[in-house]
Amino acid sequence: MQLFHLCLIISCTCPTVQASKLCLGWLWGMDIDPYKEFGATVELLSFLPSDFFPSVRDLLDTASALYREALESPEHCSPHHTALRETILCWGELMTLATWVGNNLEDPASRDLVVNYVNTNMGLKIRQLLWFHISCLTFGRETVLEYLVSFGVWIRTPPAYRPPNAPILSTLPETTVVRRRDRGRSPRRRTPSPRRRRSQSPRRRRSQSRESQC
């Protein structure tokens, strides 16, 4: 795989520093953490099993359906949009290079080795990155980080002492919103106070009842 890595370094044309670090460093196995600037780590993502992440094609379709306009815009929308855009570009470069290497290798065993390596190792890293940034844009970064921590605690807890089902990302925003709402709830009450209820004298209430009877 050293030849494949060398070709990746030479052919990668991603324009930003982040994409260059992703293609030339992180995918190559160097000690670079592309999640650090977003408050997460590679180790935190590693708690999620490989079959947890959808396929690259499904993730690309999801990103296009939800954020196509922002991804195609030359303007900077958010760090997650930029990271997602450059990850997609890097995956395209990787596929182009893998196709070229596969077509120029005469040995079928070597071609299969390249394809399996890309799909198993680099493909998983791309799936993790795509899922992370799409989820942060959809649910919010804090919610995703809370989910990763919750899942990490759940998966490391012995089965006898943990709930049978793993945490679900889509349910966290509801509990998070409720918890924050409870913290910041004002002391105002919608129901009338006892003082207001006692402000009406019995005579006033009797006059109202007589008027209602008329």
Swiss-Prot record:
Residues 186-214 form a propeptide. This is External core antigen. Residues 186-208 are annotated as: 3 X 8 AA repeats of S-P-R-R-R-R-S-Q. The keyword Nucleotide-binding does not apply. Transmembrane segments: none annotated. Residues 25-27 are annotated as: HBEAG. It comes from the Viruses. May regulate immune response to the intracellular capsid in acting as a T-cell tolerogen, by having an immunoregulatory effect which prevents destruction of infected cells by cytotoxic T-cells. This immune regulation may predispose to chronicity during perinatal infections and prevent severe liver injury during adult infections. Sequence repeats lie at residues 186-192, 193-200, 201-208. Homodimerizes. Belongs to the orthohepadnavirus precore antigen family. Residues 165-214 are annotated as: Disordered.
